Design a protein with these regions (language model features):
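Conserved serine/cysteine hydrolase catalytic core
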Residues: 192-236
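Flexible "cap/lid" loop of the alpha/beta hydrolase fold
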Residues: 107-153
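Gly/Ala-rich beta-loop-alpha elbow adjacent to hydrolase catalytic centers
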Residues: 98, 102, 106
């Protein structure tokens, strides 16, 4: 696996990993809040690698990317991060695959740069708005109850909340070794970063109907963090989106049922490639 350091928005250094076939169709994976590129290990080290170029970035403030104190409220910075990875690695019309908070970053990119450089969009257990009653209506009370711990500077309180978060992600609980790997990269994200992520307030209701590239929305039917009703929010703005409900999965279907997830993602990427020249893109 290759690693890269890319200068993102405002010069923040981003950690990026790459696996798979350099000549294959490209997927850029964008993880959720407090996670890291390691969340995608069951994609990066899978049968997808045979035919696809697989790239995963650590968001600013996460993983091995730089963690500035105050650089999380500006949509343009997030957009610049994604654009920088596309440019630095010369990604050829990637499918952008975002989990949980990741779709917000994808939409930041689309707002500022349009969709002419991408082939398609994949939302996984994702949200598209923050800081409003409509945004909060699709977030579970169990997750909301953990927010004080996410923001706590007391180590024990923070770790307890993050472990509870991880357990909420899964219907079938991960092994102890997997759980504590995940906990490690969650704990590496400072509380001020989580504060910055969730202090943003915006919706993308104006942007979603303008998207013309193919969209796949994957949602675990047993998601205990983002309620499955979020799909109705997405469909209101993305009438052309494909909807994939995974009946036995929770918030992380790419981990819990990676084989089925990867198969569906592969088919979507192939469809995006076939459609790449067939539809006009938003500017």
């Amino acid at each position: 696996m290759k690693t890269h350091k890319v200068a993102g928005g405002g010069g923040v250094r981003l950690h990026v990993v790459e696996a798979g076939n350099p000549a294959g169709r490209t997927i850029l994976f964008i993880h959720g809040g407090s996670q890291s590129c390691l969340a995608w290990s069951r994609q990066l080290d899978s049968e997808l690698a045979r035919d696809h170029r697989l790239v995963a970035m650590d968001l600013r403030g996460h993983g091995l990317s730089e963690k500035p104190r105050d650089a999380y409220g500006d949509s343009r910075l997030w957009a610049d991060d994604v654009r920088a990875v596309i440019d630095a690695l010369n990604l050829d019309r990637p499918v952008l695959c975002g989990w949980s908070y990741g779709p917000l970053v994808i939409l930041d990119y689309l707002r500022h740069y349009g969709e002419d450089r991408i082939a398609g969009i994949h939302f996984v257990g994702g949200i598209t708005k923050l800081g409003s009653d409509a945004a909060m209506s699709v977030i579970s009370p169990e997750w909301l109850s953990l927010v004080p711990g996410f923001l706590a500077t007391d180590v024990e309180e923070s770790v307890r909340s993050l472990e509870s978060l991880l357990r909420l992600c899964f219907v079938q609980q991960p092994s102890a070794s997997d759980l504590y790997l995940m906990l490690g990269y969650n704990v590496s994200v400072p509380p001020y970063v989580r504060q910055g992520l969730f202090s943003r307030a915006f919706d993308n209701d104006d942007l979603l109907p303008r998207i013309r590239k193919p969209v796949l929305i994957t949602q675990g039917a047993k998601d205990a963090i983002v309620k499955p009703e979020v799909v109705d929010q997405h469909k209101a703005g993305l009438a052309h989106a494909q909807i994939d409900i995974m009946p036995d999965a929770g918030h992380a279907p790419f981990w819990e049922d990676s084989s089925a997830f990867n198969q569906r993602l592969r088919a979507f990427v192939e469809m995006c490639s076939a459609a790449a020249m067939g539809r006009p893109a938003i500017a």
